[in-house]
Amino acid sequence: FRGEKALPALRLEKPAAGILLFGAMALMLIQLPLINATAAFNSNMHLPASLEGLENLLRTMETSAAEVTEAFLQMHGLGDFLLMLFIVAVLPAFGEELLFRSTLQPLMIRLVRNPHLGIWITAFLFSFIHFQFFGFIPRFLIGGFLGYLFYFSKNSWFPVAAHFANNGIAVTASWLISTGYLSDSPDNLGIGVNAWWQCLLSLVLLIAGMYWFRKQSKGIA
């Protein structure tokens, strides 16, 4: 009985429309240049001189975390790739979205009585809980994007799919680079002196895509 009520409560009971599901994933990938640009900006931020010791500690922690992640993503076969895709993309997509978007976000919206404020408070908590100061801004923005996917559709499958696409592209790119099929990382999109047009195009497509998603979602929410 409890299990039967769990799916409706988490907004997973309704099958997601195929075109919208792929649209949510595409929107996640479309904003890669913007996310990478904000990540580069965030990583170059500095704390006040009085907090230099804290900044050095935070940077050391994030460098160590990046090294662990890089070592973790060393894949030596298709089996390793599929396992990493499950661990890094599938599990976090379901776990984090069901916690933050399906459960916490509606509570925040009811608490503050403002959907937009509730979405961004949830996005703040989503980014904060990762404990990566120099990656806070891009993760905060991603959290807001995922929040609006859920708010517009009232269906958890869309933020889950977008979250999977975000993490999955990192695993897939790492796999393709290691096998020689890809020469450059998607993390470099939107970075560099001539990358402004990538960010501008990314922003325009994201705004248009979210307008389309909101309009199409009205028929299923």
Explain the meaning of each model-derived region:
Residues G95-I121, Y151-K154:
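Membrane-interface helix/loop boundary segments of multi-pass membrane proteins
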Residues G18-A26, L82-F86, H116-I121, F136-I137, ...:
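Hydrophobic alpha-helical transmembrane segments
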Residues S127-F131, G135-L189:
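Functionally important transmembrane alpha-helices
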Residues L32-L47, E96-L104, Q132, P138:
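Transmembrane alpha-helix/helix-exit interface in multi-pass inner-membrane proteins
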Residues F164-A221:
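C-terminal membrane module of polytopic membrane proteins
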